[in-house]
Amino acid sequence: MSLSIVHTRAALGVNAPPITVEVHISKGLPGLTMVGLPETTVKEARDRVRSAIINSGYEYPAKKITINLAPADLPKEGGRYDLPIAIALLAASEQLTANKLDEYELVGELALTGALRGVPGAISSATEAIKSGRKIIVAKDNEDEVGLINGEGCLIADHLQAVCAFLEGKHALERPKPTDAVSRALQHDLSDVIGQEQGKRGLEITAAGGHNLLLIGPPGTGKTMLASRINGLLPDLSNEEALESAAILSLVNAESVQKQWRQRPFRSPHHSASLTAMVGGGAIPGPGEISLAHNGVLFLDELPEFERRTLDALREPIESGQIHLSRTRAKITYPARFQLVAAMNPSPTGHYQGNHNRCTPEQTLRYLNRLSGPFLDRFDLSLEIPLPPPGILSKTVVPGESSATVKQRVMAARERQFKRQNKLNAWLDSPEIRQFCKLESEDAMWLEGTLIHLGLSIRAWQRLLKVARTIADIDQSDIITRQHLQEAVSYRAIDRLLIHLQKLLT
């Protein structure tokens, strides 16, 4: 037969829409025409496929060849279409007899020798293929990725000849070996931090409720050290979360997928990171740092040094848990539900009071004004991490609570939240806040008066209630008491700092 159809998958973000490769061989001048919105890398497939077919012992048809990648309105890029094009060519030229070709999907790049190479986004392609009821054949290079799925519908091959022999029923293909989580010893323990008890408490609340945290303090007080300990307090990823994170990571760094399997992402971009690097971008948009931090932590050190427009671009993803990237050739949505942890100095010199202060209140306010009010509103907790008191370093250090001990309380609090509302407190919307964060009338009036004094917004009111709800869950309390509210209000260091500076100016 001079016409053959092979199924494959594109890679558009974490989605893998189905693509049909149609090959027609007819009489006419020898040549190959490829249609269906192929990019340059796909057009180059004609040379790779030709050499791979010849070097695998087959004949390249010396006829007019037309290849259609359907649907035609979907942009296609990369070498992932090499294998399906080669198989479709061999089937159309009757060099390959495959009666069950419709039951399989093929994804892989071909070397000139006919060897198969891995492609980005193999996890998404395999997952979608299995959901559609077909089996998928991928390169052996992608074995570690598709092995995470533990699906019976994945097959791996290392050469075009092996795929052809399998489709003709002459040879069996291997299934990927299931991938287990790599066990790692905890490198950063909370007991390593000397003092800073309020900072440790704030970190516990942040981990328990999934909140966003801002650490403010002079240089060298342990802000970065505290932030790096948060992963030790968080639970391992569930199967669904692990596959989501692995699917995103496989688009940019497939080699790290197995190493980081089931581990919470912890992304710490440099403050010189561009807007595109942070939220994602490109002609066909790729994931940025906020998507790579999905289901994990995004840590921004030296917060005011980031470009203001880069930080303001995080405002919508923090609220919605996803980022919409619109470009001329593609519109892609990436998941971006992360915990934002940030650290900053209170002034350009690192201090805003005391003997070390070398800045006027105007200079300090100008420095803090690099951060917009709506962006600062997204932080549930802001803590001041002060200089350690004199003598604490010379005394014998008594280790504090370990990460394992604190993690037990975090897990118990999270269990209460999922049992009550099936989500973390940080993810509660307005109706759910009214339902699960009820206050006594006297406590509500006290909290409203406090917010008016601090000049906070309605969003800050809701975030304070969610933090108080988390504190109550840590205390195993069903109701939010005045004590819980007072502790939640105490974690508003940035507001107190701004009020202090305003008073100095008046």
UniProtKB/Swiss-Prot annotation:
Which Pfam family name is an example for this entry? Answer: ChlI
InterPro entries linked:
AAA+_ATPase (IPR003593), CHLI-like (IPR045006), Mg_chelat-rel (IPR004482), Mg_chelat-rel_C (IPR025158), Mg_chelatse_chII-like_cat_dom (IPR000523), P-loop_NTPase (IPR027417), Ribosomal_Su5_D2-typ_SF (IPR020568), Ribsml_uS5_D2-typ_fold_subgr (IPR014721)
Note the Gene3D superfamilies from the entry: 3.30.230.10, P-loop containing nucleotide triphosphate hydrolases
GO molecular function of the protein, one example? ATP binding
Member of which family?
A: Belongs to the Mg-chelatase subunits D/I family. ComM subfamily.
PANTHER family referenced in this protein's UniProt entry, alphabetically: COMPETENCE PROTEIN COMM (PTHR32039:SF7), MAGNESIUM-CHELATASE SUBUNIT CHLI (PTHR32039)
The identity of this protein, by name, is Uncharacterized protein YifB
Q: Which gene encodes it?
A: yifB
